[in-house]
């Protein structure tokens, strides 16, 4: 990796090239052509054009980036000397959760890290929320971090004040593991490295950045960092959100991608957008992180349980098609849902006739 580091830095930060364009190229040379990134950069322009169908503008931008290789080689050496590591998207050390959630179009081509890289492979929980969070939101954050630690899950946060900082501090307090996702280049985080030196050395904190190592903090980098926090996590908990900002946009984007996101149910007197996010499809949870079912959902759950009992009782008396069952029990289920339920029951036998029929299995001595 050390020999290739300069090439990865060069490719990952070509001005104007987004993740989709970079990753598509990486797939083509590393998987389809089965060559290294160094071999790719050594190809003549004619081969770039022939093998990868690159436009003249792309080739011009690649050549401009290639001219910066000596500077990036020096930067790569400096990173190594200072204990930083690079994880390209092709590496088995790259977070599989991040890759699965962001895919080709949005996964960063290169991660800069410092700390225990194994943390990237563990089950993880992101706790997100407002910089100016209320006391109850911070208490919620503490509970979720404690629960995650107890379940041996890594806590992912973004190192902003408020919920982010509370999540990190709580994970440390409960002797858990954390990932800090930076809104800046990893070489500009010197104060943070001093603060969390012990936890980093002990293997409990991993620092991650996707930006150029020397990039200073910027508001736009903080916004670009937020999707990385969400994507590094298997579970997402929202302590508090307004109707604008990074937390709101991150949750909306996650819901659009069909991710299950847990949002703290606010008290009636609170002024935040948590209820709006729940209305949009997020799962309401209490201050301990337990799911809250509203009265209508509880009623449906009870009704379904009653139907299930009646189905099993009916099938003890003979063979029935799904239509027969629905009609006799006056159920509002679809046939496909009923079939799925019947297939999942060990005590139900399927009779292979047209149409299929179902009946209760005769018990044996060892049932």
What spans do the regions from the language model cover?
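Short, positively charged patches
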Residues: 1-139, 146
């Amino acid at each position: 990796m050390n020999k290739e580091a300069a090439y990865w830095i060069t490719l990952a930060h070509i001005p104007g090239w987004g993740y989709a364009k970079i990753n598509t190229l990486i797939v083509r040379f590393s998987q389809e052509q089965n060559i290294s990134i160094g071999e790719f950069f050594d190809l003549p322009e004619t081969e770039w054009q022939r093998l990868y169908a690159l436009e003249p503008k792309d080739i011009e931008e690649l050549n401009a980036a290639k001219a910066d290789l000596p500077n990036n080689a020096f930067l790569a050496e400096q990173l190594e000397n200072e204990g930083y590591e690079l994880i390209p998207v092709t590496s088995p050390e790259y977070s599989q959760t991040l890759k699965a959630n962001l895919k080709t179009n949005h996964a960063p081509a290169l991660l800069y890290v410092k700390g225990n890289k194994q943390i990237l492979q563990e089950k993880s929980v992101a706790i997100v929320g407002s910089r100016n969070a209320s006391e109850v939101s911070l208490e919620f954050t503490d509970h979720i971090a404690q629960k995650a630690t107890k379940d041996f899950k890594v806590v992912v946060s973004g190192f902003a004040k408020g919920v982010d900082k509370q999540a990190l501090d709580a994970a440390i307090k409960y002797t858990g593991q954390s990932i800090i996702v930076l809104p800046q280049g990893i070489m500009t985080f010197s104060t943070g490295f001093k603060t969390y030196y012990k936890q980093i050395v002990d293997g409990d904190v991993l620092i991650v950045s996707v930006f150029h190592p020397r990039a200073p903090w910027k508001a736009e980098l903080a916004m670009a960092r937020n999707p990385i926090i969400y994507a590094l996590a298997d579970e997402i908990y929202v302590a508090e959100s307004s109707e604008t900002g990074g937390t709101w946009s991150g949750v909306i984007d996650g819901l659009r991608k069909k991710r299950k996101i847990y949002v703290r149910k606010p008290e009636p007197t609170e002024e935040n957008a948590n209820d709006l996010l729940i209305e949009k499809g997020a799962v309401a949870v209490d201050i301990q992180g337990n799911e809250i079912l509203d009265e209508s959902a509880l009623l449906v759950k009870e009704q379904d349980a009653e139907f299930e009992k009646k189905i099993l009782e009916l099938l003890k008396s003979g063979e029935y098609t799904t239509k027969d069952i629905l009609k006799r029990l006056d159920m509002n289920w679809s046939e496909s849902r009923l079939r799925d339920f019947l297939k999942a029951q060990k005590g139900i036998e399927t009779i292979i006739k047209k149409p299929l029929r179902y009946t209760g299995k005769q018990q044996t001595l060892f049932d």
